[in-house]
Amino acid sequence: MTILITGATGNVGRNVVEQLVNRGADVRALVRDPSKASFPISVEVVQGDLLDIDSLRHAMSGVSTLFLLNGVVADEYTQALIALNLAREAGIERIVYLSVIHSDIYVNVPHFAGKFGVERMIEHMGLGATILRPAYYMDNEIT
C-alpha cells in the first residue's frame, strides 16, 4: 500500500512525507532532482516530472494512493490532468488532491478555476478522492 507524493520537496510536500513516514506508511516521493531530496531512508525516491508521461507511469507502478501536490505554474491544470489519467490507468485507488479554499466560488480567478477544473475532473472520472481546500499558506511568502 504505497503512497506516491508529487511535489514532495516543496513546503507542503516535505511535511506530508514526514507525517506519513511517522505513521508508518510506505512513501514514494516524485522529485525532479533526486540529489536535492533529503528524506528518511524509508522513503523511495523516484525521479520524474508531472509532464513526463513515462516517468509518471514508472512512479505510479504499484501505488495505491496518489497525493497530488502540483505547484502554482502555468501548466498546473495540464499536469493534474496527465497525472489523473495515468493514475486511473495504473489502477490507483485513491487520490488526495490539494486544491484551494472556495475554488468553486472564485472561478474567475485563473488559479482557482484550474483547481476547480481538476476537482471536477476527479469527480467526472469517478476516482475515489479526498479533496483538500486549504486557505492561504503564509509560509509560502517567506520562501
Locations of the language-model features?
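Oxidoreductase cofactor-interface core, primarily capturing Rossmann-like NAD(P)-dependent enzymes
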Residues: 1-41, 51-63, 72-75, 81, ...
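Cofactor-binding loops of NAD(P)H-dependent oxidoreductases
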Residues: 48
